[in-house]
Amino acid sequence: MITGNIIKIAGPVIIGDGMRGTQIHEMVRVGDIGLIGEIIELEGDTATVQVYEETAGIKPGEKIESTGGPLSVELGPGILKSIYDGIQRPLDEIKSVSGDFIPRGIDVPALDKVKEWEFKPTASVGDKVNGGDIIGTVDETSAIVHKIMIPPKMSGTIKSIVSQGKYNVTEDIAEVETENGIETVQMMQVWPVRVGRPYTNKLDPDVPLITGQRAQDTFFCVAKGGTSAMPGPFGSGKTVTQQQLAKWADADIVVYIGCGERGNEMTEVLTEFPELEDPKTGNPLMDRTVLIANTSNMPVAAREACVYTGITIAEYFRDMGYDVALMADSTSRWAEAMRELSGRLEEMPGEEGYPAYLASRLAQFYERAGRVTTIGSHKAEASVTVVGAVSPPGGDLSEPVTQNTLRIAKVFWALDASLADRRHFPSINWLNSYSLYVDSITNWWNSQIGSDWRDLRNTAMALLQKESELNEIVQLVGPDALPQKDRVTLESARMLREDFLQQNAFDDTDTYCSPSKQYNMLKTILLYNTTAQSALADGADINKLVNLDVRVDLGKMKYIPEDEFEAKVEDIRNRITKECNEAGQ
């Protein structure tokens, strides 16, 4: 252990001397009260440390002690259902120790070292094992089986393994004979957060992450292992949209990072998720969720660490063979933390004061997403999907964080303040948003849901584009001056907007819409468009066509429960054909 002294303090940045022999990214304890920090710069025997806690009251001359290891997370049974701060300190444990406020320098282990878990071995003495091989399981929650793996860099032969029973996370459960002698395996692994966990190879992102949200799934889909950016100004619905994805996405595990956002938003998640049922298992959603809360009133430097903490936990569950969805809300606050630290370090600023390395740091984070073949003999296909919210000041999408994120992310959900003001939620602007995964996941939709899915999607997008062009004319001369076929187009596009794209997150039925229901809703609305256009060509009255009785039922389609939907939608389609034919007589 190396001990130095503080010589300079600048907010969350501290400079100390006598630190020769330490390494970049090594964890240190700063001051007499032992604040947690990380070395970010070394020059001679002088070290620059970013401190993850409030530095008020620390003075020059106090000690800095190295810990000998990098900023790392503890990975093992007990992670699920937990709420951590940005450096993986369990907030519920801190509350039981110190009350409602987090004292500085508190040292609480991330995983409970006393609690015992029921371990069931799946490997035997004499088995050859490599990094990533599963040697046993623990039923961590009612929804998730926690698979105990050999650490990534270990390989050899199992010399001994414990029998089924209760053990804590630090007890030795197996001994492996390696080239370097006998090494022990515990249920807990420790992994540095800035180093990605290994995998065998990356796979094509050709399976969609079904979210149950019509705008995202049908029009701007994200693939499992994909990256998505969600920029939007204040009040445009970023947090509710992220929470909807966390609730209903068909991932096995959800890691939700509240990075520099309001504490009330994390409170919402904490109060709602235990009450909500997972549609796949019927268990509370909290059973498959990890929360990392680094709210706006917590120290700025810890924001820089919290996204790495979150993605490392996500990669750990990916290695077990699970599909993981990671929500980062919001990456702008993380970038602002980098800007502040860069300013304290007196580095040359880039655009708008952000550091010149902003783009590479964002890329390092997003590139840890992906659908992969895991290491180990089980060779499972698993994924980490990253959805990053971006909060550009004033909704200005030309600012550096948004622009650099767009270069990396393959899906762009542009949240629009004007749509939010009109109470159109989710306020995803269908003209500005895009997905680069549509080509790769078309086969899945066509084979699993409907062979004409891509054609329907393209037709609907063309209708919405046409409506945008016609609206410019309507604002000048009014809708009555338009050709009759364009009035039907406007009406069909309005139904797409109001009856398909709008979705009520607080309605028990509409909050989640299955892929087959989405497909049938879209098909029915487009059936109205084609049938009405053909009836119009046969001489039907335009006023009758835009005021059909079935229009009311089309608007209520989204509120039909899944088990009744198929029969009712067939009836609606028959009525569309019948009423359009009657309008032409």
Curated annotation (Swiss-Prot):
<dbReference type="GO" id="GO:0005886">
    <property type="term" value="C:plasma membrane"/>
</dbReference>
<dbReference type="GO" id="GO:0005524">
    <property type="term" value="F:ATP binding"/>
</dbReference>
<keyword id="KW-0406">Ion transport</keyword>
<dbReference type="InterPro" id="IPR024034">
    <property type="entry name" value="ATPase_F1/V1_b/a_C"/>
</dbReference>
<keyword id="KW-0375">Hydrogen ion transport</keyword>
<keyword id="KW-1278">Translocase</keyword>
<keyword id="KW-1003">Cell membrane</keyword>
<dbReference type="InterPro" id="IPR004100">
    <property type="entry name" value="ATPase_F1/V1/A1_a/bsu_N"/>
</dbReference>
<dbReference type="InterPro" id="IPR005726">
    <property type="entry name" value="ATP_synth_asu_arc"/>
</dbReference>
<dbReference type="Pfam" id="PF22919">
    <property type="entry name" value="ATP-synt_VA_C"/>
</dbReference>
<dbReference type="InterPro" id="IPR020003">
    <property type="entry name" value="ATPase_a/bsu_AS"/>
</dbReference>
<dbReference type="InterPro" id="IPR023366">
    <property type="entry name" value="ATP_synth_asu-like_sf"/>
</dbReference>
<dbReference type="InterPro" id="IPR027417">
    <property type="entry name" value="P-loop_NTPase"/>
</dbReference>
<keyword id="KW-0472">Membrane</keyword>
<dbReference type="GO" id="GO:0033178">
    <property type="term" value="C:proton-transporting two-sector ATPase complex, catalytic domain"/>
</dbReference>
<dbReference type="GO" id="GO:0046933">
    <property type="term" value="F:proton-transporting ATP synthase activity, rotational mechanism"/>
</dbReference>
<dbReference type="GO" id="GO:0042777">
    <property type="term" value="P:proton motive force-driven plasma membrane ATP synthesis"/>
</dbReference>
<keyword id="KW-0067">ATP-binding</keyword>
<dbReference type="InterPro" id="IPR031686">
    <property type="entry name" value="ATP-synth_a_Xtn"/>
</dbReference>
<dbReference type="InterPro" id="IPR055190">
    <property type="entry name" value="ATP-synt_VA_C"/>
</dbReference>
<dbReference type="Pfam" id="PF16886">
    <property type="entry name" value="ATP-synt_ab_Xtn"/>
</dbReference>
<keyword id="KW-0066">ATP synthesis</keyword>
<comment type="similarity">
    <text>Belongs to the ATPase alpha/beta chains family.</text>
</comment>
<comment type="subunit">
    <text>Has multiple subunits with at least A(3), B(3), C, D, E, F, H, I and proteolipid K(x).</text>
</comment>
<dbReference type="InterPro" id="IPR000194">
    <property type="entry name" value="ATPase_F1/V1/A1_a/bsu_nucl-bd"/>
</dbReference>
<dbReference type="InterPro" id="IPR022878">
    <property type="entry name" value="V-ATPase_asu"/>
</dbReference>
<dbReference type="Pfam" id="PF00006">
    <property type="entry name" value="ATP-synt_ab"/>
</dbReference>
<dbReference type="GO" id="GO:0046961">
    <property type="term" value="F:proton-transporting ATPase activity, rotational mechanism"/>
</dbReference>
<keyword id="KW-0547">Nucleotide-binding</keyword>
<dbReference type="Pfam" id="PF02874">
    <property type="entry name" value="ATP-synt_ab_N"/>
</dbReference>
<protein>
    <recommendedName>
        <fullName>A-type ATP synthase subunit A</fullName>
        <ecNumber>7.1.2.2</ecNumber>
    </recommendedName>
</protein>
<comment type="function">
    <text>Component of the A-type ATP synthase that produces ATP from ADP in the presence of a proton gradient across the membrane. The A chain is the catalytic subunit.</text>
</comment>
<keyword id="KW-0813">Transport</keyword>
<feature type="binding site">
    <location>
        <begin position="232"/>
        <end position="239"/>
    </location>
    <ligand>
        <name>ATP</name>
    </ligand>
</feature>
<dbReference type="InterPro" id="IPR036121">
    <property type="entry name" value="ATPase_F1/V1/A1_a/bsu_N_sf"/>
</dbReference>
